[in-house]
Amino acid sequence: AFSHQAGHIQAALYSAGVLEWQERPFLAFHVSGGTTELLLCEKGEIRKIGGTADLTAGQAIDRTGVRLGLRFPCGAELEKLAEGVKPAKARPSVRGLTCHISGLENQTVKMMEEGRSKEEIAAYTIEFIRATLEALTANALELYGRMPVLYAGGVMSCRIIRESMEKKFAGAFAQPEFSSDNACG
C-alpha cells in the first residue's frame, strides 16, 4: 500500500531532484496544516521518530493569520506581512525530537493585546516555526548522525523558512506545487 505520508515523500524526492536518496537513509520533515512530523526513511520504510505533541505548524500559522484578519489558508499572506521585519527572538519548546507549538498561539495573542503590529506578529510566528524546525533538525542529526534532510509540506514553501534551512542544513525541498496533498499517488 502507498500511504499518504509516502506520497508526500515521493513527491518531495522527485521535485527536489533527489530520487537517489531512496537508496540510503535520510530524514524527512512533513510540515503542513495536517501534520508536523519528523520521519526516518531507510530501506523503503518510513518511521515517525518525532514531531509535534500538539498543534501542527500549519494550524498555528492559520490560527494566527485568521486572528490578524487574513484569508484562510494564511501562510502566503502571513509571509508577505513578515517580509523584511526583524522578528522578536523565538523560544521554541523542543525536547529531543518532540516539539510543542501551542505556546506560539498564547504568545501571539499576548502580542496582539500589547498592540504589536500585524507585521511583527507575522514575523514572530514564522520565526517560531523556523526555530522549532531548526532545533528538531539539529537534534535529529545529532542523534542519528549526518544524513540528508528532506523538507515537504505546505509550510515548507515559506521562503523565509526554506532559505534558513537550506543555509544551515543544506536540505532538499519539495517544490511548492509538489507540497500539497495528492501531489503524488
Predicted segments — roles?
Residues 1-9, 52, 172-175:
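Short, acidic/small-residue loops that bind anionic groups at enzyme active sites
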Residues 79-149, 155-174:
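A contiguous, well-structured pocket-lining segment that forms one wall/lid of small-molecule binding clefts
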Residues 20-24, 29-32, 36-119:
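A short helix-loop
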Residues 1, 30, 153, 176:
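Small/polar loops that bind or transfer phosphate-bearing groups
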Residues 11-12, 38-41, 160-162:
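Short glycine-/acidic-enriched loop or helix-start segments at secondary-structure transitions
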Residues 9, 33, 154:
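Active-site glycine-centered loops adjacent to acidic/histidine catalytic or metal-binding residues
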Residues 8-13, 175-185:
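Glycine-rich phosphate-binding/hydrolytic loop that grips phosphoryl groups
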Residues 2-27:
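Conserved phosphate-binding catalytic cores of ATP/NTP-utilizing and phosphoryl-transfer enzymes
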